[in-house]
Swiss-Prot record:
Subunit structure: Part of the 50S ribosomal subunit.
Role this protein plays: Binds to the 23S rRNA.
Lineage per the UniProt record: Bacteria, Thermotogati, Deinococcota, Deinococci, Thermales
Gene designation per UniProt: rplO
Region ranges (Disordered): 1-60
InterPro entries the UniProt entry points to: Ribosomal_uL15, Ribosomal_uL15/eL18, Ribosomal_uL15/eL18_sf, Ribosomal_uL15_bac-type, Ribosomal_uL15_CS
Protein's name in the database: Large ribosomal subunit protein uL15
Composition bias, Basic and acidic residues: 44-53
Compositional bias annotation for Basic residues: 30-39
């Protein structure tokens, strides 16, 4: 047996339907789209997830909720990312947000919040925020929480 003898199983490769290629193809002229109407045109249908035949859509009938965004620009709020105490167990000495970014535990541009899942080690932890449980566990283990000013 040679590589050139290999063939796919019968029926495994279905041929692509080529439409609009003349009457002999069986899919010429209207190219399987039928006659006239919106669905036969290029651009086709309106989005069926939103368009309801011209009546007031469900989305438009529901009330607006929350903030709709500001005209000059979006209000930028600081984004926090939580890191659990159990994830800090592999570090020694001082733990900073920069160190956690390099270690892949904190996304760049996010503020660091230490959460209390897991056991604490006696570390100096520098963060933007601490949960109550994380603060208690860290102090009980002899660690030093340092709050960063934002």
């Amino acid at each position: 047996m040679k590589l050139s003898d290999l063939r796919p199983n019968p029926g495994a490769n279905k041929r692509r339907k080529r439409v609009g290629r003349g009457p002999g193809s069986g899919h010429g002229k209207t190219a399987t789209r039928g006659h006239k109407g919106q669905k036969s045109r290029s651009g086709g249908l309106k989005d069926p997830r939103r368009f309801e035949g011209g009546r007031s859509t469900t989305l438009m009938r529901l009330p607006k909720r929350g903030m709709q965004g500001q005209v000059p620009g979006e209000i930028k709020r600081p984004r926090y990312q939580g890191v659990n105490l159990k994830d800090l167990a592999r570090f020694e000495g001082e733990v900073t947000p920069e160190l956690l970014v390099r270690a892949g535990l904190l996304k760049k541009g996010y503020r660091l919040k230490i959460l209390g899942e897991g056991e604490a080690k006696p570390l100096k932890v520098v963060a933007h925020a601490f949960s109550k449980s994380a603060l208690e566990k860290l102090k009980a283990a002899g660690g030093e929480p340092v709050l960063l000013e934002a």
